[in-house]
Amino acid sequence: MFNDMPVFDYEDIQLIPNKCIINSRSEADTSVRLGNYTFKLPVIPANMQTIIDETIAEQLARDGYFYIMHRFDEEGRKPFIQRMHEQQLIASISVGVKDYEYDFVSSLKEDAPEFITIDIAHGHADSVIKMIKHIKAELPETFVIAGNVGTPEAVRELENAGADATKVGIGPGKVCITKVKTGFGTGGWQLAAVRWCAKAARKPIIADGGIRTHGDIAKSIRFGATMVMIGSLFAGHIESPGKMVEIDGQSFKEYYGSASEYQKGEHKNVEGKKILLPTKGHLADTLTEMKQDLQSSISYAGGRDLESLRRVNYVIVKNSIWNGDSI
C-alpha cells in the first residue's frame, strides 16, 4: 500500500491559471515531437478495431497527426506499411508477443515501419522485454513503444530493454473491465499513475485510458505525459469502423475493448466489454475542437506551447470537476 503517494484521477484535479501572454489563443502551439517526427497534437486514437482502420490511419498521417494501427489484421500489416510508404507517409503498426510475431518483425527489414507498438494488456512482462530487444536488433531505426504498464519499475525495465516510449494505463478505459475482472489496474487513479511513472521515466510516456474530456489532455501533460491515447472520445464518428446500429430512430456505433469477447471471438480471459455510442459528426471536427481546447489550456497556463502546461500549479478536490453539472 502506498500511503505516501497522492492518489487522484482526472476528475479530482483542477489546474491553476497563470497570466496569459498571447494575444489570441490561436497563437498557442499544440505540436509535439515523438522520435524524429513532429505531430499537430499530443493525442493518439486508440489502436482498437472500432477506432481506427487503414482509411483513418492514412488520413491522420496525411493531416499531420500521429496514429497507431491496430494489430488485429495480421496479414494486412505488411501491405499496409508498403502502401503508406508508397504515399510518403509514416507507417505505425502494432505487434503482439506470440512466437510468429518474431518472424513477422524480421520480415520487415527491407521496408521497416517508422513506429512499432508492442501492444499487450500487461506489458511488464519478460515476453515484452524479449520482443523489444528483438525489434531493436532487427529494426534499429524503428521507434518502439511498449505497454501497457502501471508502475515506475515497469517503465524503467522496458526503457532499459530498449523501448523508446512506454504506454501507461492498466484498465482505466471506458470499455475495459480489467479492474473488475482481476482486481488489478489504474482505473480510478490513472492520472496519479501517469505522474508516478513519469517521475521515473527518461523517455516519453504515453498516457493511455481514462480520458473523458478534452481538459484531461492538458492534465495528462501536466503530470508528465508526452502523448495521450484516447478511445471513447474518438469512437462513434461517421468514419469510425464500429458497426452502425439504429435504435428508435437514433443511430449508434459499436465500441468494444481489445480484450472483449467481441474482439477475441471467444469468451476466454475477457477483460473488455461492448457499448453503443450515439453517432457523432466527423473525426476532423473532433480533432479541430481538441486543438482549440488545448490552445485555450495553453493560454490559461500562461505560455505559448505544451511545455507551459508542465509548470502550472494544481489543486486536488475530489470529484470536483462537474460541480454538480454535466455537459
Swiss-Prot record:
| Top EC category | oxidoreductase
Print the keywords alphabetically: NADP, Oxidoreductase
Query: What is annotated as the active site?
Result: 176 (thioimidate intermediate)
Q: Which domain of life is it from?
A: Bacteria
Q: Which Pfam families match?
A: IMPDH
Q: What is its EC number?
A: 1.7.1.7
Catalysed reactions listed for this entry: IMP + NH4(+) + NADP(+) = GMP + NADPH + 2 H(+)
MF terms from GO for this chain are: GMP reductase activity
- Asked whether the keyword Oxidoreductase is assigned, the reply is yes
User: Where along the chain is NADP(+) bound?
Assistant: 205-228
Biological processes, Gene Ontology terms: purine nucleotide metabolic process
Kindly list the GO CC terms recorded for this protein. Answer: cytosol; GMP reductase complex
InterPro entries given in the database record = Aldolase_TIM (IPR013785), GMP_reductase (IPR050139), GuaC_type_2 (IPR005994), IMP_DH/GMP_Rdtase_CS (IPR015875), IMP_DH_GMPRt (IPR001093)
Q: What does the similarity note say? A: Belongs to the IMPDH/GMPR family. GuaC type 2 subfamily.
As for what it does, the entry says: Catalyzes the irreversible NADPH-dependent deamination of GMP to IMP. It functions in the conversion of nucleobase, nucleoside and nucleotide derivatives of G to A nucleotides, and in maintaining the intracellular balance of A and G nucleotides.
Q: What is this protein called?
A: GMP reductase
Query: Which species is listed as the source?
Result: Streptococcus equi subsp. equi (strain 4047)
Q: What is the lineage of its organism?
A: Bacteria, Bacillati, Bacillota, Bacilli, Lactobacillales
> Which gene codes for it?
guaC
